């Protein structure tokens, strides 16, 4: 009976150790997937911030060029539209329009036009005069924006891909930067865009193998460097 009991205990111990090993592997897989997804979202935010910055600068530039003065160089009522035009850029979700920023069916151009129309409707008697009409300015503003914005957006994309982004990646200022650096630089993990024949599974496997080899320990310790045991900020 005692021998059977010992065998049962040993069997349970073996099963338990196997399940523990499986659980650890699952945890490693979950961690690697989370790290890849986290780096992807960080780079997506970086792309979004740069594209919004480009759109904002371009809209501002075009507004100053086309809305500030009239035909004879006099100040035009439409110059007051710029602030509200930039608010549209700040509020609009970048990826809702950025693949074709000047499309009439996408929200950016629609909402920019709405701003100009609203200002025109409050322009009163001045709208009857061609030299002070805001309605008359809408066409020129839109035409110049259509000519300039797609090129600027493409240039911004190229700059980001070449590592020359106008707006730096904010992750470099965060406590978790060592983990991001580990995935992107040490392991060579790439930002997935769908343009290259590379699956998320390949990226996750790369991180999983590194975790299994214990390579993630130093980056984790780097995140905790200088920690005194007090609660840490989320970032």
Curated annotation (Swiss-Prot):
Keywords: Cytoplasm, Lyase, Phenylalanine catabolism, Phenylpropanoid metabolism
Subcellular location: Cytoplasm
Pathway given in the UniProt record: Phenylpropanoid metabolism; trans-cinnamate biosynthesis; trans-cinnamate from L-phenylalanine: step 1/1
Chief location category: cytoplasm
Entry PTM: Contains an active site 4-methylidene-imidazol-5-one (MIO), which is formed autocatalytically by cyclization and dehydration of residues Ala-Ser-Gly.
EC assignment: 4.3.1.24
UniProt keyword Transport, yes or no: no
Origin superkingdom: Eukaryota
Enzymatic class: lyase
SUPFAM superfamilies: L-aspartase-like
GO cellular component: cytoplasm
Signal peptide range in chain numbering: none
Keyword Cytoplasm: yes
GO MF annotation terms: phenylalanine ammonia-lyase activity
Pfam families linked: Lyase_aromatic
PANTHER family: HISTIDINE AMMONIA-LYASE
Subunit structure: Homotetramer.
UniProt protein name: Phenylalanine ammonia-lyase
Organism listed in the record: Malus domestica (Apple)
Lineage, broadest ranks: Eukaryota, Viridiplantae, Streptophyta, Embryophyta, Tracheophyta
Chain's gene name: PAL
């Amino acid at each position: 009976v005692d021998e059977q009991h010992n065998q049962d205990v040993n069997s349970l111990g073996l099963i338990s150790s196997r399940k523990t090993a499986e659980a650890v592997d699952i945890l490693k897989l979950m961690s690697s997937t989370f790290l890849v997804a986290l780096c992807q979202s960080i780079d997506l935010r970086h792309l979004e911030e740069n594209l919004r910055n480009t759109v904002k600068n371009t809209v501002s530039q075009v507004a100053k060029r086309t809305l500030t003065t009239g035909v004879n160089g006099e100040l035009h009522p439409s110059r007051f539209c710029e602030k509200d035009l930039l608010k549209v850029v700040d509020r609009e979700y970048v990826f809702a329009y950025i693949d074709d920023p000047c499309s009439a069916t996408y929200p950016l151009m629609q909402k920019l036009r709405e701003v100009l129309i609203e200002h025109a409707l409050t322009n009163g008697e001045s709208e009857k005069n061609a030299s002070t009409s805001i309605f008359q300015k809408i066409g020129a503003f839109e035409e110049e924006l259509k000519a300039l914005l797609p090129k600027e957006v493409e240039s911004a994309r190229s700059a980001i891909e070449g590592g020359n982004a106008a707006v730096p990646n904010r992750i470099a200022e965060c406590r978790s930067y060592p983990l991001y650096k580990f995935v992107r630089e040490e392991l060579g993990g790439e930002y997935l865009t769908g343009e290259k024949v590379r699956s998320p599974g390949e990226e996750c496997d790369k991180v999983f193998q590194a975790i299994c080899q214990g390579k993630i320990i130093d980056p984790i310790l780097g995140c905790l460097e200088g920690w005194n045991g007090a609660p840490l900020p989320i970032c």
